Amino acid sequence: TKRVGSPEFGYIDIPSKWIKFFDAEVEGLIQYTDGSAYNIVTMNAVSKAEAEVADGETFNAETIAQHVAYNWSQKDNIEKMWGSKSTVSGIEAFQINIILKSGQLANTLVFQKDDKVYILSFEGDEETLDDFITNMKDTWSLDGKGAVSE
C-alpha cells in the first residue's frame, strides 16, 4: 500500500498500484484510480467558510451529507440511494450508498473533525468497493507520515 492525501483532506492508504486520476469536470480534489478510470477514490474537505450552508442550517457532517445526497439525487443515472451511519477512524460518519443504473456503485463518507467536514468517496465495482471502503475507514487520519507525493 501507499499513503496518499494532503494536509487539507487527510490521508488514506491505497493499493500501491493505484495512480493519480484527473477528472476534467472537477478541480481541487485528490483522486486516484486503479488504472481503469472505473474504480476511483476521491478526497475532499470543506470548512465553514467554503460550505454553502443556508441561514438556519448548521455547519456539520450531517448538513454536508444532506447536500451531497441532494446533489446525487439530481442526477438521472441513480438506480437506488440510501443513507447509513458508519465510522471513519473512530469518528461518526454519514454514509451515502448509491447504485447507478450502469451497475457501478458509489459510496460517500462524510464526517467532521475539528472545524472541517471531510468527504471520502469511492465509485466502482462491488468487489473493489468492499475492500476499499473498509481500508479507507480504518486508515484515514491527518497524519501524513510516509505519504507519497505524486
Regions found by a protein language model. Name each.
Residues 5, 97, 121-123:
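Residue-level detector of conserved, well-ordered beta-strand and adjacent loop positions
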Residues 18, 116-150:
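Surface-exposed amphipathic alpha-helical segments
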Residues 12-15, 61-69, 108, 130-137:
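Extracytoplasmic/secreted envelope proteins and their assembly/folding machinery
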Residues 6, 55-60, 124, 128:
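A general boundary/transition motif marking the beginning of the first structured unit of a protein
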Residues 21, 67-75, 135, 139, ...:
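Structured segments of extracytoplasmic/periplasmic soluble domains
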Residues 16-17, 82, 95, 138-139:
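Extracellular/lumenal ectodomain signal focusing on beta-strand-rich modules
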Residues 1-27:
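N-terminal "mature-domain start" segment
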Residues 24-118:
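Conserved polar/disulfide-associated segments of primarily extracytoplasmic proteins
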